Amino acid sequence: MTNIRKTHPLMKIINNSFIDLPAPSNISSWWNFGSLLGICLILQILTGLFLAMHYTSDTMTAFSSVTHICRDVNYGWLIRYLHANGASMFFICLFLHVGRGLYYGSYMFMETWNIGVILLFAVMATAFMGYVLPWGQMSFWGATVITNLLSAIPYIGTNLVEWIWGGFSVDKATLTRFFAFHFILPFIIAALAGVHLLFLHETGSNNPSGLSSDTDKIPFHPYYTIKDILGALILILVLSSLVLFSPDLLGDPDNYIPANPLNTPPHIKPEWYFLFAYAILRSIPNKLGGVLALVFSILILALIPFLHTSKQRSMMFRPISQCLFWLLVADLLILTWIGGQPVEHPFIIIGQLASILYFSLILIMMPLASLMENNLLKW
């Protein structure tokens, strides 16, 4: 008698994706982040669902409803902080996942990579709209500043912004629609993640060497299931430590002040995971130029497969490219730091230099380094 796992239409899909899936024998812990992102997404959807049961998306009561969740709902404080810090963990895993893809040449799987870029945009949009919902000072002014950027689009800009706002400023209509979009987007993200996996399983996983691993495959279960469980335990440990010991570490104190359209906070800044893009936006004195740089700073990921000039896929055996990769990582950390600083000397010039370096590394230096390495190997 055949196993139900291999015959049942639904079980067969699960079996071929998570149990009998042939996986390379040498993938390192850098390949754990896909499953961790799945765990983060499930956690965010579940905690978000319970928060939505008690939240009201009206400007008069939104802030109070969040306070009510934290004070009066059973374990409401835990659900709220798991959701807020879960977003930070989500982005940490995302950045590491993308970084892994860049380092080991996973972007050569074009369909998987492009869906991944769309996923990144979708998660960023979701996080931005979620930050607006508590209706604190930083929620309101963050929404005002970021949506206002669209007014830089020639001819249709102003109309577009007012259409998104549902009025002439960020108000009740804006909050209500942001709540609606914030609720629906994670389910769209889950569907896209399914497509992401579908495309990945067409080709099979990449591995650290960047070479074909068809000759040396092992079953996903038990080898990588147990490995993913270890990753999940570490994720849960870090998240629970953050939530239970310093839940407000990554938040902005200004968001504990109810939104006031008449009082602008001294330093408007987004959550830490957007600071690098915010620094790039601010480093260009022109509004439209800044917006284009902001969008292109993420969209540039879609160009990376076309900028691959090396004859090797992975950076494992390419020391010059490795140096440039880690320079890029350091540059992104500098941009993150600058994004949280006020707009004054010397932060302005540091931000501008870091922004120039960011684009130069990806568009010019890394492709040239790859060509140089090809010549060093006399290929």
UniProtKB/Swiss-Prot annotation:
Compartments it resides in: Mitochondrion inner membrane
Protein topology in the membrane: Multi-pass membrane protein
Ranges that cross the membrane: 33-53, 77-98, 113-133, 178-198, 226-246, 288-308, 320-340, 347-367
InterPro entries: Cyt_b/b6_C, Cyt_b/b6_C_sf, Cyt_b/b6_N, Cytb/b6-like_sf, Cytochrome_b, Cytochrome_b_C_euk/bac, Cytochrome_b_N_euk/bac, Di-haem_cyt_TM
GO biological processes: mitochondrial electron transport, ubiquinol to cytochrome c
Cofactor(s) in the UniProt record: heme b
Note: Heme 1 (or BL or b562) is low-potential and absorbs at about 562 nm, and heme 2 (or BH or b566) is high-potential and absorbs at about 566 nm.
Function: Component of the ubiquinol-cytochrome c reductase complex (complex III or cytochrome b-c1 complex) that is part of the mitochondrial respiratory chain. The b-c1 complex mediates electron transfer from ubiquinol to cytochrome c. Contributes to the generation of a proton gradient across the mitochondrial membrane that is then used for ATP synthesis.
Name of this protein: Cytochrome b
